Amino acid sequence: MEKTVSEAISLRRSVRLYKDESIDSEKVKQCLVNASLAPTSSNLQLWEFYHITDKDTLGRMAEACLGQNAAKTAQQIVVVVSRKDLWQKRAKANLNFLDQTYDKEGLSDRELRQKKMASDYYSKLIPTIYTDFLGILGFLKYVTFQIVGLFRPIYRQTRLSDMRIVAHKSAGLAAQNFMISMAAIGYDTCPMEGS
């Protein structure tokens, strides 16, 4: 029986030694779907999940994880990768979604303003924040956004290092959704970090 969210959160622990029992890949895939529903900064979802079930690949992953028991004994491994480079693709997907959502006759003034504001966000602000040539523009953007921020609310994390941190935090939120979902169906997990 699937647990409630509160039960799953209370139950979830990092398990570092797994029994030699198979787990249902379809259930793991559903947990990955749940992971994709995690909140992310600007709805950009700057991460990818790789679900590894092949025994040879699992063996290579265990080596890459420095022989940790959690990796050596896992029946399946899910790798979460931050992908800051996907911002253009994800922003375009959000713009397409906006176009489809607001593609109807007789939009109210409020709906037209909402569409314009969201479209400007993904077509103007996001490219301004994520575009940087060798980190040179980061300082200029940082100073500009700090000054503008004195007069109105504005996004202030605009340097390359800020964007990397945003991507990692979003990936962490998605990974947490995945681990809680796994706990809810009675499967144990163990987060391991690496670069």
Model-derived segments and their meaning:
Residues 1-195:
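Acidic, surface-exposed loops and disordered segments
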